C-alpha cells in the first residue's frame, strides 16, 4: 500500500525541525508557510511527554535513528489527530534540546539530518494532513486575495473611467 506525501507539509515540518535544531530561521513560502504557522498552534493541544523516562532507553549512536522512529510512532499511537502530531513534534524538540545540552551523548549531523528527513516524510503522509488543518486557512487566504484583487480592479476601473469621461 503506497501513500502520497504532501510536499508542502514536508517542507513546513522540515523547516520547523531545522529551525529548532540550528536555532535559526528557515523561510518557506506559500502553503508551506501557512502550515508552518499552524504547527505552532498544535502545541496548545499537546499531551505531557515523560521525556526523562523515554531518554533513559536511548541506545548508542548506531541505533538512535530507529529508536527515534519507534518512539515517535509509539507517541502517535496510530492516531491521526492534532494531539498526537503535536506531541510527536514536541518530542522532537525535546530530543534536539537533549542533544544540544549533552555533548557527550551528541549525535553526528548526518544522522540528525536523516532523522529530520524521516520525521518530515512520516508527517507529510496524507493520513496526517488533517492534523495541520491547512485547507481552511489556505482557502480563506486565497479568497481574501481574490477579493482584494477585484476591489483594486474595480477602484482602478472607476478612476480610469472618471478620468476618461472628464477628458472627453
Swiss-Prot record:
Keywords from the UniProt entry: Early protein
Highest taxon of the lineage: Viruses
Induction remark: Expressed in the early phase of the viral replicative cycle.
Pfam families: Pox_B6
InterPro entries, per the entry: Vaccinia_virus_B6 (IPR009974)
Recorded family membership: Belongs to the orthopoxvirus OPG191 protein family.
Protein name: Protein OPG191
Organism: Monkeypox virus
Amino acid at each position: 500500500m503506497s501513500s502520497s506525501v504532501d510536499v508542502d507539509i514536508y517542507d513546513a515540518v522540515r523547516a520547523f525541525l531545522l529551525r529548532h535544531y540550528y536555532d535559526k530561521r528557515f523561510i518557506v513560502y506559500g502553503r508551506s508557510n501557512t502550515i508552518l504557522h499552524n504547527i505552532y498552534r498544535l502545541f496548545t493541544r499537546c499531551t505531557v511527554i515523560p521525556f526523562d523516562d523515554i531518554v533513559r532507553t536511548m541506545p548508542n549512536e548506531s541505533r538512535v535513528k530507529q529508536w527515534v522512529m519507534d518512539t515517535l510512532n509509539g507517541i502517535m499511537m496510530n492516531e491521526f489527530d492534532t494531539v498526537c502530531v503535536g506531541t510527536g513534534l514536541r518530542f522532537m524538540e525535546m530530543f534536539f534540546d537533549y542533544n544540544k545540552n549533552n555533548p557527550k551523548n551528541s549525535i553526528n549531523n548526518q544522522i540528525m539530518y536523516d532523522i529530520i528527513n524521516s520525521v518530515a516524510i512520516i508527517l507529510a503522509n496524507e493520513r496526517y494532513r488533517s492534523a495541520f488543518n491547512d485547507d481552511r486557512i489556505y482557502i480563506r487566504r486565497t479568497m481574501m486575495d481574490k477579493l482584494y484583487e477585484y476591489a483594486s480592479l474595480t477602484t482602478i476601473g472607476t478612476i480610469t473611467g472618471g478620468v476618461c469621461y472628464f477628458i472627453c
